[in-house]
Design a protein with these regions (language model features):
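Phosphate/ATP-binding catalytic cores across multiple sugar-kinase/actin-like superfamilies
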Residues: 87-101, 149-156, 275-301, 316, ...
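Early-domain small/polar-rich strand-loop-helix modules and first-structured segments
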Residues: 1-73, 131, 194, 360
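Phosphate-binding glycine-rich/basic clefts of nucleotide- and phosphate-handling proteins
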Residues: 180-269, 340, 354-412, 447, ...
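Gly/Thr-rich phosphate-binding beta-strand-loop-beta motif of the actin/hexokinase/Hsp70
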Residues: 1-24, 33, 154-189, 239, ...
Length: 456
């Protein structure tokens, strides 16, 4: 008997969810130690954790965005590390943080829906190298985080059956929008739009600049030095924590520790709203443009589902509700929706055909620098069973996975769920006159024979 476990991978946070307990969230930071297993997250992620060790380790960041990259990550001490294996170690540390055992768990991992097939395959291959993640020769099931999040929200709040739903994932590196059909087991009906100008990192940066405006010239921070970089990173982390507190509180305090300046400033929710107002407006306009490109409108959506850490910001829900006039569904823990959905899929224990849940090789068109991707009518969508999606690239930039996909069913099964494809038939060549044979002159043959006799 295996216990179900759901994991989710984000650019800034990793989440683990298991039955009967609150999901565990850690920053996508891995600390390597020579005498013990690696630790995931920041020391202040959990006051009861064992991250606060007396001996400092080697801190690794940025490995989530480097999965599948052949170039190794270089740490501060000069050592090199494979980003794929770092991701596996971070996932294993998340399993331990959730109080589970990877060897005795039925694991489903929610990966970003915009990942390329090669990225997904690289993670799958790396998972097979870890004995804890390989049970009976099978690696954990990888699912798109969009599908996992929809299952989580549907189980908690109930999504109306029939019609199209707009899924908005407010993540740390950007906001991702996918139109999904609720009448076909949450099948995507559009390419995923990646909007990078409204993200958790951008909000943190805006709040950091606001702090510098409040502090003025009292701080003597030199960002060119190693000490200055460390102090700036700590201040940015405090800004992130203050942003998260303002999702439930109307005012919070932020400690500022800089060379020549040690103070505490107050930040209100109204100030944060002013900082993100323009970015949120630009995102809503980009969403309008995406709907128009897909020949739909807000009235065609049955509801709007918001997930991700940014969905907890009250202003986001207010603006979407006023603009769309549609019901807004947000889970109780939107940042953990993908992990919770992966847990539900692992609990079912059924094998789901994800060929219709993700796409590869979408013909895309970017317009006006908005990062919007459209699938023109009549174009062919190529489906990869094991890979997730390759949605963010234009057609001239699409990279196809170099790993062959095994056929697990009749490739000509017309009853299987799939996207309709338009076949380009080649017309047979017209009848051409018979090709004239080259004539060989008798004189040429005689000259050749004489030359051969002379040589002998």
């Amino acid at each position: 008997m295996y216990d179900p476990l759901g994991l989710s991978i984000g650019s800034t946070n990793l989440v683990a969810a298991c039955n009967g307990s609150t999901p565990v969230t850690r920053r996508a930071v891995l600390t390597l130690y020579p005498h013990c297993a690696p630790k995931v997250g920041m020391p202040n992620d959990d006051s009861d954790s064992d991250l606060k060790l007396s001996e400092p380790g080697t801190t690794m960041t940025g490995f989530v965005g480097r999965i599948g990259d052949s170039v190794a990550l270089v740490s501060a001490d000069g050592s090199t590390h494979d980003p794929d294996l770092l991701m596996v170690e971070a996932l294993d540390a998340m399993v331990c943080a959730a109080g589970a055992d990877s060897c005795s768990s039925e694991i489903a991992i929610a990966v970003p829906a915009y990942w390329k097939p090669g990225t997904v395959q690289a993670l799958r291959d790396a998972l097979r190298t870890h004995i804890g993640f390989v049970r009976s020769g099978m690696a954990p099931r990888l699912v798109p985080d969009s599908l996992a999040a929809m299952n989580a929200v549907n189980a908690e709040l109930g999504i109306p059956v029939g019609g199209v739903v707009g899924l908005l994932d407010f993540g740390g590196s950007g906001t991702y929008v996918t139109l999904m059909d609720t009448g076909s087991d949450f099948e995507p009906v559009s390419a995923t739009m990646r909007y990078l100008d409204f993200s958790g990192a951008e909000i943190d940066q805006a709040l950091l600049l606001h702090v510098f405006e409040q502090v003025g010239h009292r701080g003597n921070l030199d960002p060119a030095t190693t000490t200055g970089i460390g102090q700036l990173s700590q201040l940015r982390e405090r800004c992130r924590e203050a942003k998260e507190r303002l999702s439930t509180d109307t005012v919070t305090e932020l400690a500022v520790e800089l060379p020549g300046c040690s103070t505490t400033i107050q930040v209100t929710r109204a100030q944060l709203d002013d900082l993100i107002q323009d970015r949120l407006t630009a995102f809503i306009y980009a969403f309008d443009d995406m709907l128009a490109r897909n020949k739909t409108s807000w009235t065609d959506l049955t509801t709007v589902v918001t997930v991700g850490g940014g969905a907890s910001i009250p202003l986001v829900r207010q603006r979407l509700s006023l603009h769309t006039r549609r019901p807004i569904l947000t889970a109780k823990l939107p940042a953990a929706s993908a992990a919770t959905g992966a847990l539900l899929l692992a609990t079912r224990g059924e094998r789901i055909d994800y060929r219709t849940k993700s796409s590869l090789g979408l013909l895309a068109a970017h317009a006006g620098g908005t990062g919007i991707i459209e699938l023109p009518a009549g174009d062919v969508m190529v489906i990869d069973q094991d890979a997730m999606t390759d949605r963010e690239l234009a057609w001239s930039q699409t990279e196809y996975g170099d790993v062959p996909v095994l056929l697990t069913r009749d490739p000509y099964d017309e009853e299987a769920p799939c996207w309709s494809m338009r076949l380009n038939l080649l017309e047979p060549a017209k009848d051409l006159p018979p090709r004239r044979r080259r004539r060989v002159r008798v004189s040429q043959v005689l000259i050749g024979l004489c030359a051969a006799v002379a040589m002998t």
